[in-house]
Amino acid sequence: MKKTKFFLLGLAALAMTACNKDNEAEPVTESNATISVVLKTSNPNRAFGNAGDEAKVAKLTVMVYKGEQQEAIKSVENAIKVENIKCGAGQRTLVVMANTGGMELAGKTLAEVKALTTELTEGNQEAAGLIMTAEPVEVTLVAGNNYYGYDGSQGGNQISQGTPLEIKRVHARIAFTKIEVTMSQSYANKYNFAPENIYALVAKKKSNLFGASLANSDDAYLTGSLTTFNGAYSPANYTHVDWLGRDYTEIGAATVNTPKGFYVLESTYAQNAGLRPTILCVKGKLTKHDGTALSSEEMTAAFNAGWIVANNDPTTYYPVLVNFESNNYTYTGEAVEKGKIVRNHKFDINLTITGPGTNNPENPITESANLNVNCVVAAWKGVVQNVIW
C-alpha cells in the first residue's frame, strides 16, 4: 500500500513538473496579481533572405522581479505578448527578452540577468531568431489584473497604456549594397578589379545584453579571413571562423536575397585599450583594365607598391572600417557616433573602387586611398556609408 502511495505521489510530481515546463520552472510565489505584457518590435527590413526574419520573435520571455529576487517567469512561442503572469502586487521590475534559445533564465537574480553576455555565432547569420532585449522597467502592480502597453479596453490596471514595451535587436547588420569599379583617370587604362569574396575581417566576439551600451572591454575578436594579417588594427585575441566569409555575388535584383554582409555585435573602437574597429572587406584579383591577368612585370610593380599580396599573386583587398571617421567616407541616415557599432542598426555600404587596393587590409587606410564609401544608417535604424577606394 505504501509503495502504491509513493508511486502515485511520484507521478503527481512528474505531472506538475511537466505543467511548469512552458513557464521555465516558474518560481513559486503567493500571487494576488497578474501582469500581461505586449511588445513593440523594431522595424523589420529585408534580411539576408526572407524580409520578416530579422523581426521574428520565436520565443518571448518575461521575468518579474521583487527587488533582486525573481518572482515569476513565463515564456511563449511565436507571439509578441505574454499574458496572465502570476505574481504579487507592489513595486516590481519587468525584464523582457526574446529569442534566447537555450539560455537558462529561471531563478537568476536581477543582477545576474543584467550581467548576461552573448557571443557572435554562425546561427546569428541566419537572420531568424536574432536575440532581442529591453532594458528593465519598474512598475507598480495592484491586486488583480495588470496590463502593460495595452490599449485600455481590457480594464484592470493599465500601465504605459497604448505604448508597448519596445525590444531591440542585440545585433547590428553590416552589408555592401553596392560595389562599383570605376577606375580614376590614373588607373582606367591600366587596372581593373574582379571581386571574389566578402569578409567580416574584424568583428567583436562578445557583447553585453543589457545597458546603455552593449559594448564591453573584452578584446576577443572573430575574422572570416583565412589569412592572418599583422596590422595596426589586427586584434591580439583573434579567432578564424569560416561563416564570416562568403563568396561574392554580383549585387542586383537577381541576387537581392543573397547575403552581402553579416550580423555583428556592438563594439567601440579604442586602439590603446586593444579594442579594434569593425571591418568589412572585399577580396579579389587586380587585373589589367580589360580583365586579363597582370604580367609578371606588372605584378612585381603592384607588389612593390603594396597593392597585391605577392609578386606572383594579384590578390588585393578593399577594407571598409564600418562607421569610421575618414575623408573617404560619407554618411546619410541616422547619426551614430563614429568608431562604434550600435545595436539594432543596419550599416549599408556603397563602395566605389577607383584604383588598386592593399595587401594589408588591417592597416590604417591613407586619406588618398583609392576608394569612396557612402554609408546609410537606419533603424532597424540604418546608416548608409559611401566609400571611395
UniProtKB/Swiss-Prot annotation:
Chain residues carrying a lipid of type N-palmitoyl cysteine: C19
Region listing for Important for oligomerization and fimbrium assembly, in residue ranges: 380-389
Gene Ontology biological-process entries: cell adhesion
Keywords: Cell adhesion, Cell outer membrane, Fimbrium, Lipoprotein, Membrane, Palmitate, Signal, Virulence
InterPro entries referenced in this protein's UniProt entry, alphabetically: FimA_C (IPR053878), FimA_N (IPR029141), Fimbrillin (IPR008110)
Domain of life: Bacteria
Segment forming the signal sequence: 1-18
Keyword Lipoprotein: yes
GO-annotated cellular components: cell outer membrane; pilus
Subcellular location: Fimbrium; Cell outer membrane
Site residues, Cleavage: R46, A47
One GO molecular-function entry: structural molecule activity
Keyword 4Fe-4S annotated: no
PTM annotation: Synthesized as palmitoylated lipoprotein precursor. Efficient export to the outer membrane and integration into fimbriae requires lipidation and subsequent proteolytic removal of the lipidated propeptide.
UniProt propeptide residues: 19-46
Residue numbers with lipid attached (S-diacylglycerol cysteine): C19
Function: Structural subunit of the major fimbriae. These long, filamentous pili are attached to the cell surface; they mediate biofilm formation, adhesion onto host cells and onto other bacteria that are part of the oral microbiome. They play an important role in the invasion of periodontal tissues. Fimbriae and their constituents are major virulence factors. FimA proteins from different strains have highly divergent sequences, and this has been used for classification. The sequence-based classification correlates with pathogenicity.
Complex formation: Fimbriae are composed of a major, structural subunit (FimA) and the minor components FimC, FimD and FimE. Head-to-tail oligomerization of FimA molecules mediates assembly of the fimbrium stalk, while the minor components probably form the fimbrium tip. Linear, head-to-tail oligomerization of FimA is mediated by a conformation change, facilitating the insertion of a C-terminal beta-strand into a groove in the N-terminal domain of the following subunit.
Family assignment from sequence similarity: Belongs to the bacteroidetes fimbrillin superfamily. FimA/Mfa1 family.
Other remarks on this protein: The name (major fimbrium subunit) does not indicate the abundance of the protein, but is derived from the greater length of the major fimbriae. In strain ATCC 33277 and strain 381, major fimbriae are 300 - 1600 nM in length and about 5 nm in diameter. In contrast, minor fimbriae are only about 80 - 120 nm long. This length difference is observed only in a small number of strains, including strain ATCC 33277 and strain 381, and is due to a loss of function mutation in FimB, a protein that restricts fimbrial length in other strains.
Name of the protein in its database record: Major fimbrium subunit FimA type-3
Organism of origin: Porphyromonas gingivalis
Gene name of the encoded protein: fimA
